[in-house]
């Protein structure tokens, strides 16, 4: 913990082709071991596949997919009198985006297609069509929050 106050948030730079910060965040989430150029190659490849299969602008499809994955509420564990309660809380806007990208990349990695670009493209297209594992994760998160609505008064 720094003593000089809060650490300022680092701003990500938009990528050169799509001029989008959210695309850069996708690349950064996909990156392993600092291999950013490889992650960019995979993302651009995935966007090319999305464009060829949907005949639409890939960034539009990606933003639609993000809208369908982004969670609004989640549950957080809260200990009250020796019992743990799952308390539903609203998700902050920056965390919403981060969670959506994390889920998208995570479930893309688990898919069965041959290359990572194909997996990512498949997950993006599925999410844009309200199907796929990432959308299911969002629905499950919302269901969990709905089921624990009774503990909402424990919010902090």
UniProtKB/Swiss-Prot annotation:
One BP term from GO: translation
Record InterPro entries: Ribosomal_uS7, Ribosomal_uS7_bac/org-type, Ribosomal_uS7_CS, Ribosomal_uS7_dom, Ribosomal_uS7_dom_sf
GO molecular-function term, one example from the UniProt record: tRNA binding
One protein family per Pfam: Ribosomal_S7
Membrane spanning residue stretches: none
Domain of life: Bacteria
Family annotation (CDD domains): uS7_Bacteria
GO cellular component term, pick one: small ribosomal subunit
Keywords for the protein's UniProt record, in alphabetical order: Ribonucleoprotein, Ribosomal protein, RNA-binding, rRNA-binding, tRNA-binding
Function: One of the primary rRNA binding proteins, it binds directly to 16S rRNA where it nucleates assembly of the head domain of the 30S subunit. Is located at the subunit interface close to the decoding center, probably blocks exit of the E-site tRNA.
Family: Belongs to the universal ribosomal protein uS7 family.
HAMAP family xref list: Ribosomal_uS7_B
Record text on subunit structure and interactions: Part of the 30S ribosomal subunit. Contacts proteins S9 and S11.
Protein name, entry field: Small ribosomal subunit protein uS7
């Amino acid at each position: 913990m720094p003593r000089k106050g809060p650490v300022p948030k680092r701003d990500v730079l938009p990528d050169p082709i799509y001029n989008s910060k959210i695309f850069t965040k996708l690349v950064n989430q996909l990156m392993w071991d600092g291999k950013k150029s490889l992650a960019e190659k995979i993302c651009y490849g995935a966007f090319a596949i999305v464009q060829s299969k949907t005949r639409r602008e890939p960034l539009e499809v990606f933003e639609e997919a993000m809208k369908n994955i982004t969670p609004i509420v989640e549950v957080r564990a809260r200990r009250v009198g020796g019992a743990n309660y799952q308390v539903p809380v609203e998700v902050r806007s920056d965390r919403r985006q981060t969670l959506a990208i994390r889920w998208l990349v995570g479930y893309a990695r688990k898919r069965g297609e041959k290359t990572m670009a194909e997996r990512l493209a498949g997950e993006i297209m599925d999410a844009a069509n309200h199907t796929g594992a990432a959308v299911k994760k969002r629905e499950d998160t919302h269901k969990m929050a709905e089921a624990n609505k009774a503990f909402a008064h424990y919010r902090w």
